[in-house]
Amino acid sequence: TGQSKWGEKITRKDHFYKARVVEDTYDWGEYVQPSREPKDLIIYEMHVRGFTRHESSGVEHKGTFEGIREKIPYLVELGVNAVELMPIFEFDEMEDVREYEGRKLLNYWGYNPVCFFAPNTSYASALEFNREGNELRNLVRELHRNGIEVILDVVFNHTAEGNEMGPTFCFKGIDNNIYYMLTPDGQCY
């Protein structure tokens, strides 16, 4: 988790972020957030990586927040007025690697989040500290400017920390009994 290159395992000798403090100086500019009745929404559900990773997408920044931003005219042309982004939060794609027909299969979907508060680093188009946060903000701002609402698919019912034997990434360390249902003795989740 926290890897800037998709599908490359971080080794002990590699340096990676364990925590970050982000100064929020992003300029949202002037725009109005769209607000439609749910019955009027035309929703396009998409996966950040999957929507633009193929060459046929025609975007420069394939499989990233920036790649989706490049496709906004296409979404407008379709008549879409809301996008639902499948999990965009930090997760470990190397969590359960498997082989199939000689190819490495990764945790593609992101349904085992590590942190609900951090966009997935590998969805940024450039390997630059905190780029993913600004690229996500740019995407949301431009979707809104084009009249497209943003819905986030957030997974609250399980995380990459697993059960009581799993690793501690953040939720257990922040406040275990707030983030997890515990047994009456407070030991298991």
Language-model segments: which ranges?
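Intrinsically disordered, low-complexity segments enriched in small/polar residues
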Residues: 24, 42, 72, 177-178
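Substrate-binding/active-site clefts of carbohydrate-active enzymes
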Residues: 12, 47-67, 73-189
